[in-house]
Amino acid sequence: MLSRSRCVSRAFSRSLSAFQKGNCPLGRRSLPGVSLCRGPGYPDNRKMVINSGSVFRVRFFQTTAVCKNDVITVQTPAFAESVTEGDVRWEKAVGDAVAEDEVVCEIETDKTSVQVPSPANGIIEALLVPDGGKVEGGTPLFTLRKTGAAPAKAKPAETPAPAHKAEPAAPAAPPPPAAPVLTQMPPVPSPSQPPSSKPVSAIKPTAAPPLAEAGAAKGLRSEHREKMNRMRQRIAQRLKEAQNTCAMLTTFNEVDMSNIQEMRARHKDAFLKKHNLKLGFMSAFVKASAFALQEQPVVNAVIDDATKEVVYRDYIDISVAVATPRGLVVPVIRNVETMNYADIERTINELGEKARKNELAIEDMDGGTFTISNGGVFGSLFGTPIINPPQSAILGMHAIFDRPVAVGGKVEVRPMMYVALTYDHRLIDGREAVTFLRKIKAAVEDPRVLLLDL
């Protein structure tokens, strides 16, 4: 028996040595009762000293291997240069199981909301920032303990099979009807002789009717307060900054939309078939604005208040205002001077879809040299837009209405749109602003102006 035990112990030692050297034919499977920490998943090898004098002692020897990467700390993603901090709104709580790429929290910045997904399948161990707390780029947000598989989705509860319905018993005999409740006083027999006193006009009820609620008569008046979100605070700050910094002045004109409507009606089907895009009016105004900005480069420039210099931009990046439930956002169409109508429509559709889904990145709204705001989609007839700093001008579009206009000495009904240009009078003179707006008017009313570069 002793010799057999020594043989088994010696064989076990050789097998264990071969296993640690990577020559074990069993691969990475461990022996019963022994947990080993060797393999590509563990960067450092944990050595074990095992007394091979008795196989029974080895049999009951155990160790616990903990991977260093089981618990990870997720940090705030890097923000753009124009964004310094944001507010955290948690979607998950401690102990919740999350799958890879599942949103754990949302960081609301001055310009947009950034979603922070889980980098792996796991369970949230700790939230390092309170709900509503302010964070900067690279701030630790939460710790996650990784698990091997995604959390199983809860199966819908099975509805139990309907039990066998028992035959309804014969209905019992209905109870005898209750005696009717007297709701009126019994009639008073009229006397044979007329009464000496005056007759009673009506019998007063024994109980007075319930009084109506005082609140219902006067009407309810209440109010409640909601904290401004960070985006609304930033919008208010920037608008007030523009009002305090810029010398804003607005000039107006009107655009005859007859030709552009006719062109759209004639080519919209072919445009949709070739580009898989609907041809709208915004692309015409964006392209016309780029054409006018090239003719009047001072409108595309900006004043650097720190150095007291005028910065002229050789590129044209046009911001298009998009209304969302959270507020107004202005994604940027870059290098518009190199685009055609199809490129502009495609970019507008992509940015608008991302804005409605709250998926705009901060980079999508950085920069911009000129802004277009279309209040006409809401039925606005007339308005004066506010400059989007640090830009120097903004174009306001409005609704299209049929109006009588004088054309060639005759009165005709034409589809007309009012347009407004608000500009920084510190940099742009009135002559340049009016010339710029007339260029836009000419390019929209007759797109051949763009082809002929007139």
UniProtKB/Swiss-Prot annotation:
Which GO terms of the cellular component aspect does the record hold? Answer: cytosol; mitochondrial matrix; mitochondrion; myelin sheath; nucleoplasm; nucleus; oxoadipate dehydrogenase complex; oxoglutarate dehydrogenase complex
Tree of life domain? Eukaryota
Annotated source species = Mus musculus (Mouse)
Identification of the protein by name? Dihydrolipoyllysine-residue succinyltransferase component of 2-oxoglutarate dehydrogenase complex, mitochondrial
| Chain positions found as N6-lipoyllysine | 111
Q: Which NCBIfam families does the entry mention?
A: sucB
SUPFAM superfamilies assigned to the protein according to its UniProt record, in alphabetical order: CoA-dependent acyltransferases, Single hybrid motif
What does the UniProt function comment say about this protein?
Answer: Dihydrolipoamide succinyltransferase (E2) component of the 2-oxoglutarate dehydrogenase complex. The 2-oxoglutarate dehydrogenase complex catalyzes the overall conversion of 2-oxoglutarate to succinyl-CoA and CO(2). The 2-oxoglutarate dehydrogenase complex is mainly active in the mitochondrion. A fraction of the 2-oxoglutarate dehydrogenase complex also localizes in the nucleus and is required for lysine succinylation of histones: associates with KAT2A on chromatin and provides succinyl-CoA to histone succinyltransferase KAT2A.
